[in-house]
Amino acid sequence: MKKNLKILVITGGVISGIGKGVTSASIARLFRYDFRVTPIKCDGYLNTDPGTINPVEHGEVFVLDDGGEVDMDFGHYERFLNLNAKSSWNITMGKIYKKILENERKGKYLGRTVQLIPHVTDEIKSTIFQIASSENSEMLIIEIGGTVGDMENILFIETVRQIRHEVGSGNIAFIHLTYVPSPVGINEQKSKPTQQSVKTLNKAGIFPDLIIARSSQVLTDQIRKKIAMFCNVESTSIIDNIDVSTIYEIPISFYKQGVHEILSSKLNIKVDPKIEELSRLVGIIKSNFFVPKKIINIAICGKYAELDDSYASIRESLVHVAANLDLLIKSTLIDSNDLNESCLKDFDGIIVPGGFGGKGYEGKIIAIKYARENNIPFLGICLGLQLAVIEFARNVCGILDADTEENLIKDKPLKNPVIHLLPEQKEIKDKGATMRLGGYPVILKKNTIAFKLYGQDRIIERFRHRYEVNNDYIDLFEKNGLIVSGFSSDFKIAKLIEIPKNKFFVACQFHPELITRIENPAKLFLGLIKACI
């Protein structure tokens, strides 16, 4: 462990889904210019990673350059800290138990009874300190998933309690994000849930240094004093985290409330946050939110419409473009399971995102056909590219039975599999972490929309797929007006397609939304919106 390593631990209380990831990323941003900050997310589920979890249940799966499939909070970490995270930074209980069982089989515990304490907590600690060492970290931001009191995160809570004992109280600070409700009809803020949450944390041996109150309005002085008294913190250490028009306001709000000063005092360090550029971009977002200079309406035609977080990074990509083009983008998620052309008539542009399986498949094809025939700016992502190829094959090339091998029925081969399984996938049976995953180079063809947007002929983008365009059909597609504008580095796999005669009809096999930054929006989203103006 590095000497003078500083650690910030963020826990959540009352309810989940109130923004621990954004809160953690916002605090980390205040320290990123003065310290080498490494964010760590601890998840209590027994999955090795979220790669096989339904997005409707857990939110989108975020893919890293190293091929790791991690929690969506890593999207916030990367975007707020402008770094490329590593899959090892996402510690799941599934990974920990797997390592414990492997160690036991190898005899590393020398015949001792393997127990939750000390063996599991020691493994978590070892993993955390290994990350700090390998990254030469000066500060760790450790976010513990779920809420205090959940059975799933008890061992993570116990681990950070032990870490405090080992590193000393001057090198670690505990931040508790809680929810202060204002029940409808009562019109009064209630502190009792926060009190109970903090008491649960106290029983585990942790006493927060900072309480961040998630609420719809600024806390009243009365509630602030009440929380301070019952939770044993200074009233100045209770921070407002109210509803905002954009999450990029939150680091600025924390800065204005002196979060960095409170934590710096606790850790005996100096920090000088730089928020000028972020403040400028947030100012543009807010001004257009209230008095828009121009409004662009975008349809996101997705199959996981039950949960907005299923497409969180696409939403963020559009926010980044809006800030840089000084306009307002209104995005609407349309369920592709129940989509017809009338749903699309009021939109300036259409996005068809990724997904798996046949559900919602034909609805997406309807959206693609509508965009192509009506010259509406279109961006297809991953499955969106594959379905764009199928739509073109059916409705332009006349291959009416064109389809993907993903829809293959056993013992009934497709006559025209214009999308087929990647060769390296044919012998793979396991589902978890077996796709083409992570950052790969893409070679762009000159004089194409993609080349003009990127300004270079070689780019790195992130992938998550098993299927590809069948090269046997590419000549036919190009004769009919659909070109391949980007290939894999060996020129064997189509990665980008375009229809040059359309204003903007582009689809990519990769996920451009995974590398967007507010200071540097993803190029394909930028091109889409510019085409809509």
UniProtKB/Swiss-Prot annotation:
Binding sites annotated in the UniProt record for CTP: 16, 150-152, 190-195, 226
Protein function: Catalyzes the ATP-dependent amination of UTP to CTP with either L-glutamine or ammonia as the source of nitrogen. Regulates intracellular CTP levels through interactions with the four ribonucleotide triphosphates.
Protein name from the UniProt record: CTP synthase
Other notes: CTPSs have evolved a hybrid strategy for distinguishing between UTP and CTP. The overlapping regions of the product feedback inhibitory and substrate sites recognize a common feature in both compounds, the triphosphate moiety. To differentiate isosteric substrate and product pyrimidine rings, an additional pocket far from the expected kinase/ligase catalytic site, specifically recognizes the cytosine and ribose portions of the product inhibitor.
Region Amidoligase domain: start-end pairs: 1-269
Family statement: Belongs to the CTP synthase family.
Pathway annotation from the record: Pyrimidine metabolism; CTP biosynthesis via de novo pathway; CTP from UDP: step 2/2
Protein residues bound to L-glutamine: 355, 383-386, 406, 466
Species assigned in the record: Borreliella afzelii (strain PKo) (Borrelia afzelii)
Top-level EC class: ligase
PANTHER family: CTP SYNTHASE (PTHR11550), CTP SYNTHASE-RELATED (PTHR11550:SF0)
Gene responsible for this protein: pyrG
Residues annotated as binding ATP: 17-22, 73
Any GO BP annotation: pyrimidine nucleobase biosynthetic process
Activity control: Allosterically activated by GTP, when glutamine is the substrate; GTP has no effect on the reaction when ammonia is the substrate. The allosteric effector GTP functions by stabilizing the protein conformation that binds the tetrahedral intermediate(s) formed during glutamine hydrolysis. Inhibited by the product CTP, via allosteric rather than competitive inhibition.
Domain of life: Bacteria
Assigned keywords, A-Z: ATP-binding, Glutamine amidotransferase, Ligase, Magnesium, Metal-binding, Nucleotide-binding, Pyrimidine biosynthesis
Residues annotated as catalytic: 382 (nucleophile), 511, 513
